[in-house]
UniProtKB/Swiss-Prot annotation:
Keyword Repressor: no
Name of the protein: Zinc finger protein 189
The organism of origin for this protein: Homo sapiens
Keywords from the UniProt entry: DNA-binding, Isopeptide bond, Metal-binding, Nucleus, Repeat, Transcription, Transcription regulation, Ubl conjugation, Zinc, Zinc-finger
Residues covered by the KRAB domain: 14-89
Upper taxonomic lineage: Eukaryota, Metazoa, Chordata, Craniata, Vertebrata
């Protein structure tokens, strides 16, 4: 009886090799026993699925007995270093109907080829018998052949199983579900990796540092930290990376691509992580919490930097002097001391600085900006450190303590000056890079810090100063320089403090408030004078008649009654006056057309439209004469 001819091969039927996974010798050695067991189970499951779905390329009349007939995968290491992995399924006892499926993973260790590609004369007798008696043996598909092509995106695949997996990207199919949380995945391997979240299993351990991972690919990437391997190189700049995704992100620098867009403000980012961090500015989310002080941060990097305050860690060390810093930015700024680099240039005066913060503070000299205001008294400052020092006046805080006698000071300069009592040091150095003269500061306080010594001399008039900044300001009297310009009216000033006071004319700002009556002033000196009304203090006394005044200007004007001095002279009629306001009122006579009779004071020359106003005015002269 003739043997029945094999049925024609149906279109779309699979061989077991279509869904088989092949390992190289190196990959197989890397797997632990549990992983090899998993591999065996998956291969058996795949074969069982093919048989149960009736898509296997075999006789339809044959009934598989998968459970009993699939033998264990045997792992035999041949003398030639070849892995032997078999799966056998005996269909029935009929020799013509018997079909043995064997997943042959025999790889030559040196050349990486399959068993059937080795010349027959090079095989052992056992290997020749195995190859010749195997009914279905197919070569591993050529890595260049990609016969399975995706109609959606055109991507090609060598294996049909990979092609099927890829199609789920387009269809969104996720047939593999987690029993714990119900989350579904497109691949069974993804489920296995995901389930380790629930079990806490981390089977992949680093041989270098002992760190464990739940996914093998994460371990491979991690080990590149130890080996220094960077297999992914940029074609544009030749920079290499340890991870492919890092290369993809890097290439956006060259292409300018920013695919991640913020839905709130429209700002785009090249990296998704940057978008996530940016979105926290809208949501206010701060998911990273410090376990020491409960402070929270929007970025993990900020938390890491903050935690060094508690640990005292200073990982960034200067190669020149050995000084260590908590942040890399601090180290970069410090290194400019050694290099002398000053990349930040002021466009107004050309002065350069090593830090951008120094430039910003300097530019406030030109703009007159004083953004730091004291909530207690309203005084404002151009630098935060100056405000901090000033606030100690209100709080009474004296953080600088003398180790010799225990006396405390609110400023470090006060402590330094005091310590010279103990050391008998008689010199008074001044660090101009740390502190600068503030016109609003008490001159008495500054003279206590820098007593007597005035080493800065003006070449024009010989006047000396204890601080170089004071000399620079003084020299503008001789040069006429007025570098501080009002942007509103164009008026210029020799000092930034003068500009600030002037700008309050435009803004109407009156930051100095009297606590007694609530009256406010644009200048601190006016507030001090006003407060004399409440205190009744009149420190300025006339030596001639004993009359006292709350202001020095009032005393000077009064003394002209005794001396007869009239320094204010009218250019029209040569008449002179003891007070400037009297001259101003007098000049109105020349400037305005007389439409009515005016009444002029014989004592000072001030004119009035009403006679009663003149009489009231003359009472001032008679009161002063008493």
């Amino acid at each position: 009886m003739a043997s029945p001819s094999p049925p024609p091969e149906s279109k779309g039927l699979l061989t077991f090799e279509d869904v088989a996974v092949f390992f190289t010798q190196e990959e197989w050695d890397y797997l632990d026993p549990a992983q090899r067991s998993l591999y065996k189970d998956v291969m058996m499951e795949n074969y069982g699925n093919l048989v149960s779905l009736d898509v296997l390329n075999r006789d339809k009349d044959e009934e598989p007995t998968v459970k009993q007939e699939i033998e264990e995968i045997e792992e035999e290491v041949e003398p030639q270093g070849v892995i032997v992995t078999r799966i056998k399924s005996e269909i029935d006892q009929d020799p013509m109907g018997r079909e043995t499926f064997e997943l042959v993973g025999r790889l030559d260790k040196q050349r990486g080829i399959f068993l059937w590609e080795i010349p027959r004369e090079s095989l052992t007798q056992e290997q020749r018998m195995f190859r010749e008696n195997t009914n279905i043996i197919r070569k591993r598909p050529n890595s260049e052949e990609k016969c399975h092509k995706c109609e959606e995106c055109g991507k090609g695949f060598v294996r049909k199983a990979h092609f099927i997996q890829h199609q789920r990207v387009h269809t969104g199919e996720k047939p593999f579900q987690c029993n714990e949380c119900g989350k579904s995945f497109s691949r069974s391997s993804f489920v296995i990796e995901h389930q380790r979240i629930h079990t806490g299993e981390r089977p992949y351990e680093c041989n270098y540092c002992g760190k464990t991972f739940s996914v093998s690919s994460t371990l491979i990437r991690h080990q590149r930290i130890h080996t220094g391997e960077r297999p992914y190189q940029c074609n544009q700049c030749k920079q290499s990376f340890s991870q492919r995704r890092s290369l993809v992100k890097h290439q956006r620098i060259h292409t300018g691509e920013k695919p991640h867009k913020c839905s709130d403000c429209g700002k785009a980012f090249s990296w998704k992580s940057h978008l996530i961090e940016h979105q926290r500015t809208h949501t206010g989310e701060k998911p990273y919490h410090c376990t020491k002080c409960k402070k929270s941060f929007s970025r993990n990097s900020l938390l890491v930097e903050h935690q060094r305050i508690h640990t005292g860690e200073r990982p960034h060390k200067c190669g020149e002097c050995g000084k260590a810093f908590r942040l890399s930015t601090y180290l970069i700024q410090h290194q400019k001391i050694h290099t002398g680099e000053k990349p930040f240039l002021c466009i107004e005066c050309g002065k350069s600085f090593s830090r951008s913060s120094f430039l910003i503070e300097h530019q406030r000299i030109h703009t007159g900006e004083r953004p730091y205001q004291c909530k207690e008294c309203g005084k404002s400052f151009s630098q935060l450190c100056n405000l901090t020092r000033h606030q100690r006046i209100h709080t009474g805080d004296k953080p600088h303590k003398c180790e010799e006698c225990g006396k405390a000071f609110s400023r470090s300069s006060g402590l330094i000056q005091h310590q010279r009592i103990h050391t008998r040091e008689k010199t008074y150095p001044y660090n101009e890079t740390k502190e600068s003269f503030d016109p609003n500061c008490s001159l008495v306080i500054q003279q206590e810090v820098y007593p007597k010594e005035k080493s800065y001399k003006c070449d024009e008039c010989g006047k000396t100063f204890s601080v170089s900044a004071h000399l620079v300001q003084h020299q503008r009297i001789h040069t006429g320089e007025k570098p501080y310009l009002c942007t509103v009216c164009g008026k210029s000033f020799s000092r930034s403090s003068f500009l600030i006071e002037h700008q309050r004319i435009h803004t109407g700002e009156r930051p100095y408030l009297c606590r007694q009556c609530g009256k406010s002033f644009s200048q601190l000196c006016n507030l001090i004078r006003h407060q004399g009304v409440h205190t009744g203090n009149k420190p300025h006394k006339c030596d001639e008649c004993g009359k006292a005044f709350s202001r020095n200007s009032g005393l000077i004007q009064h003394q002209r009654i005794h001396t007869g001095e009239k320094p204010y002279k009218c250019e029209k009629c040569d008449k002179s006056f003891s007070q400037q306001r009297s001259l101003v009122n007098h000049q109105k006579i020349h400037a305005e057309v007389k439409t009515q009779e005016t009444h002029e004071c014989d004592a000072c020359g001030e004119a009035f439209n009403c006679r009663i106003s003149l009489i009231q005015h003359q009472k001032l002269h008679t009161a002063w004469m008493q």
